[in-house]
A protein has these predicted regions:
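Hydrophobic alpha-helical scaffolding
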Residues: 141-144, 189-193, 302-306, 359-363, ...
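Active-site core of glycosidic bond-cleaving carbohydrate-active enzymes
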Residues: 246-336, 444-463
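Bacterial N-terminal signal peptides
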Residues: 6-18
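Aromatic-lined carbohydrate-binding surfaces of glycoside hydrolases
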Residues: 23-254, 258-259, 284-286, 332-360, ...
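C-terminal non-catalytic alpha-helical accessory regions
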Residues: 321-564
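Terminal, non-catalytic domain-edge segments
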Residues: 566-590
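Positively charged n-region of N-terminal signal peptides that target proteins for export
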Residues: 1-5
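Generic recognition of stable, solvent-exposed alpha-helical segments in well-folded globular domains
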Residues: 46, 96, 100, 153, ...
């Protein structure tokens, strides 16, 4: 065969491959991230029919009762879950729920992928095979051959038990056992890069290749897999690409915080990627107040062009044409712990709608998709549409200024001062670090601002945020729509945001004045008294909003987070810090 013809054939093959890659349908997935250890979230997004109607191609099922916890391991050892035992009955009931979830998804015409923490194994299995699967520290280890053998058996039984399951979403690092009482587990990544490679190759062989099922391997882990380009490539370059193996990556370099960089691992390497986006922002109200983030996710947040200039990409729009772009995965509901709890998921629906519809057709602009949302939700009049658009864009500006800063340096650790339903104070934490206390971070920030003569300016920014929320409340009163419940919730949730950020502004003001007093020995008691009264009135109005409006979300609490159920807080936090200075104003001792 002439060399020129051979060259032409190779060129044709590459062209066809490129065309195939360009015409692949993107994954448009959704997940409800149920709170571990709590009743399942009541939401439309649990319904596969609803997901299908909204254009999703698949459901990530994450109730933390994992599909691989719903198998018996009888082939390995029938004593792991003996016949007639309560443990086996639990497994049987869990398996029936998995089957029902698979049937429901397929009946609706979408695929289903089970969220899977690895390592999670039966407690009895670990006790029986402890010496063969555990390391010197008592942790289950993938460095032990028996552990790998058991996981091969586990995957075999998993897909034999649930042959219609479309695939798995794999998480390492965090291991949630709250909903699996007869199982135990730990992080499998004990040897860095090589642990990931060993696990991914196992999953690729057993799931993608042998069974033609899909693996979404989440990079969310410890040690750099998620946020280090070098680490990510060190792992993925050792893995042969497979059409059923997709890497799943949050759009942020770290967790879903506004001041975090765009993820540098996106687009690099030789594997398909799907991008995770949180809609019910766990560190920013969870849908209790307006917080529209998809303009920032798709086009780039304002801070990426101001206080946090990006070295590389800064938005999904910039990477949508990458050969590795495989779709989007919305976390429509959930993330984090406890509240605030919402009964109206309007703001979650808005974020989920825009990211999923844009992901289906990335040639659309974010604003075009946003306009379609208004069409679908009965926001018809020009004045209402203008007010709603302005409100949503303003909410993104208000949130970063209220929770972090849009003007000044804000360290990546300080963002944890507020999370879930909690407001931290300026004390140093008094519980073990393993409980992930949120107290202590704000004191670090205040110290840095004080030393750099910026504390007053930062506090002024918080006071200015209240004016933005006043504008949002005004705009909410201009929005008319077909659904009266949603129209009412826009108004109530906007007032919620205004009052919460008033509490934050006045709480920060009190703590800042007190902080300066602690440093100098001189407390401006007159000003402290003024802001203490404002702070108390803020809380009174905030509580009245909830009492008078059934649709209002549950309220924030002036405590710092600690990872102890069921309350997830102790006594430290904003309330304790404010009360310290109240006593000083009253003339009492600290």
């Amino acid at each position: 065969m002439p060399l020129r013809l051979i060259a032409s054939l190779f060129a044709l093959v590459f062209l066809l491959n490129d065309l195939a890659a360009q015409t692949e349908e993107p994954y448009i997935l959704d997940m409800v991230h149920n709170n571990p250890g709590e009743p399942l979230t009541v939401t439309a997004f649990n319904n596969p029919i609803y997901l299908k109607e909204k254009g999703y191609t698949g459901q990530v099922k994450n109730d933390f009762t994992f599909a691989h916890a719903a198998i018996t391991f009888d082939k390995l050892n029938p004593q792991i879950f003996p016949q007639g035992s309560k443990e086996r009955e639990w497994v049987m009931q869990a398996a029936e729920r998995v089957r029902n979830n698979i049937k429901a998804a397929h009946a609706a015409g979408i695929k289903i992928y089970y969220f899977t923490d690895i390592i999670v194994l039966p407690k009895k299995l670990v006790a029986l095979y402890h010496d063969e699967i555990c390391d010197a520290k008592g942790k289950i280890s993938f460095e032990r051959p028996k552990t790998i053998e058991i996981h091969r058996m586990m995957l075999d039984e998993l897909f034999a038990t649930f042959p219609d399951l479309d695939g798995l979403v794999i998480r390492t690092g965090e291991t949630y056992l709250n909903n699996v009482p007869y199982h135990t587990g730990n992080n499998p990544i004990t040897n860095g890069v090589e642990s990931h490679v060993k696990l991914i190759n196992l999953l690729r062989d057993e799931v993608c290749e042998k069974r033609n099922k899909t693996i979404f391997y989440r990079t969310w882990s410890f040690g750099g897999m998620h946020d280090s380009a070098a680490y990510y490539l060190a792992v993925t370059n050792q893995i042969e690409p497979h059409p059923n193996l997709i890497f799943s990556i949050k759009h942020t370099k770290g967790d879903y915080h506004r001041t975090y960089d765009f993820n540098p691992t996106l687009t690099i390497g030789k594997h398909k990627q799907i991008i995770e986006v949180e809609c019910q922002r766990e560190y920013e109200g969870k849908g209790a107040f307006p917080n529209y983030v998809m303009d920032g996710v798709i086009n780039g947040f304002e801070e990426y062009s101001t206080t946090k200039p990006q070295q590389g990409y800064k938005s999904l729009n910039e990477i949508k044409d990458s050969k590795n772009f495989g779709g989007v995965w919305s976390w429509s509901r959930g993330g984090g712990w406890v509240g605030p709890y919402i009964s109206n998921e309007f703001w979650c629906k808005l974020n989920a709608y825009v990211i999923s519809q844009w992901g289906k057709d990335t040639k659309q602009s974010e604003e075009t998709v946003f306009n379609h949302f208004m069409d679908d939700n009965g926001i018809k009049e020009a004045a209402s549409r203008k007010a709603f658009r302005e409100l949503c864009l303003l909410s993104a500006k208000a949130v970063i200024r209220g929770h972090e800063s849009a003007k000044y340096y804000f360290d990546k650790d300080w963002v944890w001062w507020s999370r879930d339903e909690f407001l931290g104070g300026i004390d140093t934490f008094n519980v073990p670090q393993k409980l992930y206390p949120s107290e202590g971070f704000l004191s670090q920030g205040f110290r840095w601002y004080y030393e750099h003569h910026l504390l007053d300016s930062v506090i002024q920014e918080k006071q200015e945020v209240v004016k933005l929320w006043q504008q949002i409340v005004g705009l909410s009163n201009q929005v008319e729509m077909t659904n009266q419940q949603d129209e009412g919730y826009i108004k109530v949730s906007s007032k919620y945001g205004f009052l919460l950020h008033s509490i934050i502004a006045d709480g920060w003001k009190i703590m800042a004045m007190g902080f300066v007093g602690d440093k100098t020995g001189n407390y401006d008691k007159k000003q402290l008294a003024i802001y203490l009264k404002k702070y108390d009135n803020d809380w009174k109005a905030y509580n009245e909003l909830k009492a008078n409006n059934p649709a209002c979300a549950t309220l924030y609490k002036p405590y710092a987070f600690i990872n102890i159920a069921p309350t997830y807080h102790a006594e430290q936090g904003m309330a304790a810090s404010v009360e310290k200075y109240r006593k000083i104003v009253k003339g009492g001792k600290e």
